[in-house]
Amino acid sequence: MLFAALRDVQWRKRRLVIAIVSTGLVFAMTLVLTGLVNGFRVEAERTVDSMGVDAFVVKAGAAGPFLGSTPFAQIDLPQVARAPGVLAAAPLATAPSTIRQGTSARNVTAFGAPEHGPGMPRVSDGRAPSTPDEVAVSSTLGRNLGDDLQVGARTLRIVGIVPESTALAKIPNIFLTTEGLQQLAYNGQPTISSIGIDGMPRQLPDGYQTVNRADAVSDLMRPLKVAVDAITVVAVLLWIVAALIVGSVVYLSALERLRDFAVFKAIGVPTRSILAGLALQAVVVALLAAVVGGILSLLLAPLFPMTVVVPLSAFVALPAIATVIGLLASVAGLRRVVAIDPALAFGGP
């Protein structure tokens, strides 16, 4: 019966090719959406990792060192720096801002850190900013060293380029000195949003808490939660569409082969063997569609304006998910086969 199912696939190859390509495109879009969600996290992880700190010290109750921070005066910085387990401490600040590009404005995320860190990323070209009027920018902005950049109400000189530094769905990052960020966002007040530390403090002054890198990444991703949830819903709907495509093909195949199935039953072929052949047909279609989907996802990902990083686990899981979809999609056809009367084999044309 399995051989008969594969022969049927061969004879109906045109229809099945259309189903495989259609389902493969759905699988590809699902992989791209998975990569889009993963890309949000990868961006945040790259940003946090580039700062080169082991942990962040924030005010007690703050949700994180970036978007969930509670700004505070840096008067306690020396005390934190002397805490047991702290190798180095630096005042850090973060604020959303805009830059001017011709007649239009573009959102950026501004970070402030000392020139030599911790907290200042390495640049691929130029150097780190050393004065409040200098800035290092993401290479995604397409700016050159020596250009003037209007950030908010200030005009800064670009002295460094940070490779592919983005967060919050491809929003470019820019890096100033801590004093430069304070002038940009806090009217020059000695206010910071966190203290970046090397090492791990065993005791902190009252009113402060430690945030590890994983929680810092989550803080940077928090504004994207609604978008991630929406993308997840769309991905689930696409899985359902894939199952419907495969199911419709298998069901039509079952309807067209009713006489064949009746003959099989009449000559004593077990129903379970017939069902296995039909299920195999659905699984073959789904698995071939998974291969097509994996290839298409690699071609589609670069076309998206945001970072798309499809995790290896998604490619590994796709064949298993495709198999489950194939089996579920074959249910309608299986029920039709079970109901076939063997007497149909002896009926007229």
UniProtKB/Swiss-Prot annotation:
Residues 111-131 are annotated as: Disordered. It is a multi-pass membrane protein. The lineage of its organism: Bacteria, Bacillati, Actinomycetota, Actinomycetes, Mycobacteriales. The keyword rRNA-binding does not apply. The chain crosses the membrane at residues 17-37, 230-250, 284-304, 308-328. It comes from Mycobacterium tuberculosis (strain ATCC 25618 / H37Rv). Belongs to the ABC-4 integral membrane protein family. Pfam families: FtsX (PF02687), MacB_PCD (PF12704). It is found in: Cell membrane. Keywords: Cell membrane, Membrane, Transmembrane, Transmembrane helix, Transport. Its main location: membrane. GO terms for cellular component: extracellular region; plasma membrane. It comes from the Bacteria. This is Uncharacterized ABC transporter permease Rv2563.
